[in-house]
Swiss-Prot record:
This is Protein-methionine-sulfoxide reductase catalytic subunit MsrP. Its main location: periplasm. Belongs to the MsrP family. GO terms for biological process: protein repair. Its EC number is 1.8.5.-. SUPFAM superfamilies: Oxidoreductase molybdopterin-binding domain. GO terms for cellular component: periplasmic space. Predicted to be exported by the Tat system. The position of the signal peptide cleavage has not been experimentally proven. It comes from Rhizobium meliloti (strain 1021) (Ensifer meliloti). Binds 1 Mo-molybdopterin (Mo-MPT) cofactor per subunit. HAMAP family: MsrP. The keyword Oxidoreductase applies.
Length: 313
């Protein structure tokens, strides 16, 4: 696997102002704040994180836009539904079960997850719906967690599941369900272990809001946003490709790989351009060209050498 070549840091990048807590008090404070945040998900703890060289060249999307324009069907299908309907969701206490083809299956509590060395990474995020953002995530490499459980040689894929709590997630209740729960996603093991792939516990210097996937979510910046599964409760290593929610719902529209590709259109719209949220102009003005692999081709294209990306979309 090629080593990551960090892009240059542009002077125009927005670094949000925030304060930092002592490392020991931070872990307890962050976990405690999540527990106390119900039903006020806006109350978030500041997160201590080192500034990584993994930074997009673009200015960050305004925090208000990134936390009020979301896809999280567990809270509703409208873009404003997750922020409006997630106040009763309880992101603490929390555990993530890691099992399957591993030598040391175990559960990770929230304080253990927050204790991983955290970095701020400013990534581009491209939705399959042809809009995008630039978000300062806080998290740690997924590979660091996988190393703790010692994947077996037979493990080829990594499967993920979101929590199911219809009493707290109104999109999971009711007669009509837009998707099958739990929400599931998957990656090849080499994708999961790539340095760009992280588990995020925060954004904009604070713990994740409920509507953005609290308390922990996946971020894979060269893939469409639906691969970034939220509110993860289980990670399993498997030998075969795991089922993925949107791929099951519409296999001709949402592929397993879901790599950002301007040359492969969605059956119902073009993927050649995108609207950057916060800049306006969805119907033509201020649209920008979509980059192969969302601008990360130099670092990840070799993962798919020899593959027909029109077939393996």
């Amino acid at each position: 696997m090629p080593s990551y070549r960090a892009p240059k840091i542009a002077a125009a990048e927005i670094t949000p102002e925030r304060f930092f807590l002592d490392r020991r008090t931070f872990i307890a404070a962050a976990a405690g704040s999540l527990a106390l945040s119900v039903p006020k998900p806006s109350r978030a703890a500041a997160l201590e994180a080192s500034k990584s060289t993994y930074r997009a060249d673009d200015p960050a999307t305004p925090e208000k836009d990134a936390t009020t324009y979301n896809n999280f069907y567990e809270f509703g299908t409208g873009k404003g539904d997750p922020a409006a309907n997630s106040a009763n969701f309880k992101p603490a206490p929390w555990t993530v079960k890691v099992d399957g083809l591993v030598g040391k299956p175990r559960e990770f509590g929230l304080e253990e997850l927050l204790a991983f060395p955290l970095e701020e990474r400013i990534y581009r995020m491209r939705c399959v719906e042809a809009w995008s953002m630039v978000i300062p995530w806080i998290g740690f490499p997924l590979a660091a967690l996988l190393d703790r459980v010692e994947p077996l040689g037979s493990a080829k894929y990594v499967a993920f599941e979101t929590v199911v709590r219809p009493e707290e997630m109104p999109g999971q209740s009711g007669y009509f369900q837009p998707l099958e729960w739990p929400y599931r996603e998957g990656l090849r093991l080499d994708e999961a272990r790539h340095p760009l792939t992280i588990l995020s516990v925060g954004l904009y210097g604070k713990t994740l809001p409920n509507q953005n996937g609290a308390p922990i979510r996946l971020v894979v910046p060269w893939k469409y946003g639906f691969k970034g599964i939220k509110s993860i409760v289980r990670i399993s290593l498997t030998e075969t490709p795991p089922p993925c929610t949107w791929n099951l719902a519409g296999p001709s529209e949402y592929g397993f790989y879901a790599n950002v590709n301007p040359a492969v259109d969605h059956p119902r719209w073009s993927q050649a351009t995108e609207n950057r949220i916060g800049e306006g102009g969805f119907f033509g003005a201020n649209r920008r060209d979509t980059l192969p692999f969302n601008g990360y081709a130099e670092d990840v294209a070799s993962l798919y050498a020899g593959m027909d990306l029109r077939v393996n979309f």
